[in-house]
From Swiss-Prot:
GO annotation terms (biological process): symbiont-mediated perturbation of host apoptosis; symbiont-mediated perturbation of host ubiquitin-like protein modification
Name assigned to this protein: E1B 55 kDa protein
Chain positions covered by the region annotation Disordered: 1-27
Keyword Phosphoprotein: yes
């Protein structure tokens, strides 16, 4: 017991007195920074998430760590400033489409001057813009139509827009090419005009071309047409030169010429209705998942007699609803999963074998000259009501027809003979096989 009392007394003597924390004037606790001890510049450099005032509807801002750098969005700037900065410092990757300030044009404004100064133009929704003179585009151009109507008051054959490859387009993300979107090109008067002549890569997105346009799009340096509607035009799209053209999700209705391309063309998920010539393809290309339909043969433009020429008119042949011109250097175009109703397909002389896989030929005619019929392969094709004709000249008889080149030529009459030996023998080859199955189809 005495030993225990000695231990207790020793602990009492060795124990430190309790520390009394007095926080008076000028005294600060451990780890606490007194604000008036910092300068004004130091106080401004403190980083607090509450000071950013960011929209935080999902409550994720507070979960950011201190080592994350938050970049505040910059405001929009004028196109002229971006252009001047690139001329001074060279191309960069810091500018994007959303960084360019949009100019809202009103009816009556000088569109050519606005495009040159601002590049990114927005039209009023549903407004009508009278085009009294040709608009020349030399540099960057992005027009947001908002379903505005562009109505031409121009002489016959004059272009509403002429895109020239003159000025350098600044390095702006998603503004690398000329863009026309959501515009209605109207031509109600008797003057047939050209909507656009382009010598630069151009994108036409969700535009409508209505009325008797002489030529809607004259493409000379490649283009992409997406979701557009062509109604009642003489020629909807014509492509020249070595550049390719791409058409997707578009509608061609009651046009004398739909797509006329002398080079490579890619057409997919589009519809051609009552067009005298839906496609005239001079080079190689791809036609897939499209519909070609003729509902009448007596109404305009289906009653037109058309032709196409080779060698400056030295060789002229009648034009089919789908026409593959002779080209001894190019193969047959890829033709997959298309639907043809009352359509005449003309095939010139080319290399290889033509195989329209997974396509439907309903009440259609495939016409080809001598020596080409044997290169048609109808395996996995719905050809129950399809006729194959071999063409040959019928003497000296000829008629004058409108040509794809814009001139008129004397076209020789042709004699046709039915060919049946190219069909698949269904007594030997069963249709209850994987012949008509595609790996791209969903198994529903």
């Amino acid at each position: 017991m005495e030993q225990d009392s000695d231990l207790e007394s020793g602990r009492a003597t060795n124990q430190r007195p309790p520390r009394v924390r007095v926080r008076g004037a000028g005294v600060r606790g451990r780890g606490r920074v007194r604000r008036r001890a910092l300068s004004e510049g130091q106080r401004r450099s403190l980083f607090r998430l509450d000071d950013l005032q960011l929209p935080d509807s999902l409550y994720v801002t507070r979960a950011l760590q201190r080592d994350h750098a938050l970049e505040m969005p910059r405001g929009q700037v004028d196109f002229s400033l971006i252009e001047a900065e690139e001329r001074r410092a060279g191309p960069t990757d810091e500018w994007y489409f959303e960084s360019v300030k949009t100019y809202r044009a009103k009816p009556g404004d000088d569109l050519q001057t606005l495009i040159k100064n601002y590049a990114k133009i927005s039209l009023e929704c549903g407004a009508v813009y009278e085009i009294n003179s040709k608009i020349v585009v030399t540099g960057a151009c992005y027009i947001i139509g908002n379903c505005a109507v562009l109505r031409a008051n121009l002489p016959v054959g004059t272009a509403m827009f002429e895109v020239l490859n003159v000025d350098v387009i600044p390095s702006i993300g998603f503004m690398e090419r000329i863009v026309f979107s959501n515009i209605l090109f109207d031509c109600r008067s008797t003057t047939a005009v050209v909507c656009c002549i382009s010598e630069r890569n151009t994108l036409f997105h969700n535009c409508v071309f209505s009325g008797p346009h002489m030529l809607c799009l004259d493409i000379r340096a490649g283009a992409e047409v997406r979701g557009c509607h062509f109604v009642g035009a003489v020629c909807a799209l014509r492509s020249k030169g070595l550049y390719s053209v791409r058409v997707r999700n578009s509608i061609f209705e009651k046009c004398a010429f739909g797509v006329v391309s002398g080079s490579k063309a890619s057409i997919s998920h589009s519809m051609f209705k009552d067009c005298a010539c839906c496609i005239m393809l001079g080079g190689q290309g791809t036609i897939a998942h499209s519909h070609f339909m003729a509902t009448t043969c007596t109404d305009t433009p289906m009653n037109l007699q058309l032709c196409t020429c080779e060698g400056n008119g030295s060789h002229v042949v009648p034009l089919g609803n789908i026409h593959f011109a002779s080209n001894r250097e190019a193969p047959w175009p890829t033709f997959n999963a298309n639907v043809l109703v009352r359509v005449r397909l003309y095939m010139g002389r080319r290399r290889g074998v033509f195989h329209p896989k997974q396509s439907t030929f309903s009440m259609c005619v495939i016409a080809a000259p001598r020596g080409v019929v044997q290169r048609i392969y109808l395996f996995s094709v719905y050809d129950a009501t399809c006729a194959i004709l071999q063409l040959g000249e019928a003497g000296d008889a000829a008629t004058e027809r409108l040509c794809t080149c814009g001139m008129r030529h004397n076209t020789p009459s042709l004699r046709a003979a039915y060919v049946t030996d190219t069909r698949i023998d269904r007594e030997i080859n069963s249709q209850d096989t994987a012949e008509f199955f595609s790996s791209d189809e969903d198994n529903l």
